[in-house]
């Protein structure tokens, strides 16, 4: 009987990166790592520039040297498309969408969730997904789909701190952790003050 396909959801943050490292270290089946890049417009990535450089110049080449195939997904729509698009239903129909709201980000749904869902529909039945959720994130672990989603961090007893240290020791810790404890687009409405400060100080072209 042929084994199911195994994929790792990978943002190239510490938890998903550590998941891939654990899979390789323990001989867990892994067919590919899947990354979805949100775009600001057709040319500019939504990733903080340091993280995007890390992904394409360090992380993806490292995974490929390990024998891990990396799939990069992008939505047809960009942040600018959504910002300038018009609402098509409801009492605000016809109005320009403009800025995304905290806790209700259309960019997350249209530019990340949908391309991932489309890709998942192309996978064979029974595909198993590794997700980067640490042992000390119990609320998130409880939401995993039994049998279809697996946390290798939980399986091998790794906390978020352990994941950070594993990536650091492997030379695969994103530089964004120097100024933030989370990943996210540089235009994210949920960005914390240190992230906004970093953007203003180091990427004034994006701030403007």
Tell where the protein language model's regions lie, with residue ranges.
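Nucleotide-activated chemistry modules centered on ATP-dependent adenylation/adenylyltransferase
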Residues: 1-208
């Amino acid at each position: 009987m042929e084994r199911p396909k195994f994929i790792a959801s990978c943002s190239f943050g510490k938890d998903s990166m550590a998941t891939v490292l654990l899979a390789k270290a323990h001989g867990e089946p892994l067919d590919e790592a899947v990354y979805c890049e949100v775009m600001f417009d057709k040319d500019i990535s939504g990733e903080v520039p340091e993280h995007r450089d890390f992904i394409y110049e360090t992380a993806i080449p490292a995974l490929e040297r390990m024998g891990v195939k990396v799939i990069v997904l992008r939505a047809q729509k960009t942040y600018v498309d959504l910002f300038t698009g018009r609402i098509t239903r409801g009492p605000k129909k016809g109005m320009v969408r403009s800025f995304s709201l905290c806790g209700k980000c259309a960019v997350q749904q249209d530019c990340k969730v949908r391309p991932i869902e489309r890709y998942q529909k192309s996978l064979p039945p029974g595909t198993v997904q590794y997700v980067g959720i640490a042992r000390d994130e119990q609320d998130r672990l409880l939401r995993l789909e039994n049998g279809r989603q697996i946390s290798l961090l939980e399986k091998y007893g790794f906390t978020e701190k352990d994941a950070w240290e594993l990536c650091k020791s492997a030379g695969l810790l994103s530089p964004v952790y120097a100024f933030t404890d989370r990943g996210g687009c540089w235009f994210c409405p949920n960005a914390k003050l240190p992230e906004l400060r970093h953007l203003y100080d180091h990427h004034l072209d994006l701030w403007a």
